């Protein structure tokens, strides 16, 4: 499966998370996943909450439209974004 897949108006992202980074950003491809750096530490779900908030802002959707489908406790995650209003250029160039 590729890093970014469009499915019935939603986006499925296969991401690799880098917690405790110096800034929040979508880095680019990391193998067959999209690498996302976030500033939050991987403690008590803080990284997941921060990731959801960051992706919601990047894709211009409410936080409730960002779902972590797989990988709740690991760095490799699958995320569904429901009908994104905006697709960042780092992601749109990876769309099939």
From Swiss-Prot:
GO terms for cellular component: cytoplasm. It holds the Pfam family DUF167. It comes from the Bacteria. SUPFAM superfamilies: YggU-like (SSF69786). PANTHER family: UPF0235 PROTEIN C15ORF40 (PTHR13420:SF7). Belongs to the UPF0235 family. This is UPF0235 protein Sputcn32_2690. It comes from Shewanella putrefaciens (strain CN-32 / ATCC BAA-453).
């Amino acid at each position: 499966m590729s890093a970014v897949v469009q499915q019935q108006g939603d986006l499925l992202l296969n991401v690799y998370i880098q917690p405790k980074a110096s800034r929040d950003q979508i880095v680019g491809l990391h193998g067959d996943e999209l690498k996302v750096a976030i500033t939050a530490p991987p403690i008590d779900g803080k990284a997941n909450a921060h990731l959801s908030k960051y992706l919601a802002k990047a894709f211009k959707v409410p936080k409730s439209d960002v779902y972590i489908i797989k990988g709740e406790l690991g760095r490799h995650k699958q995320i569904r974004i429901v009908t994104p209003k905006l697709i960042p250029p780092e992601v749109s160039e990876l769309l099939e």
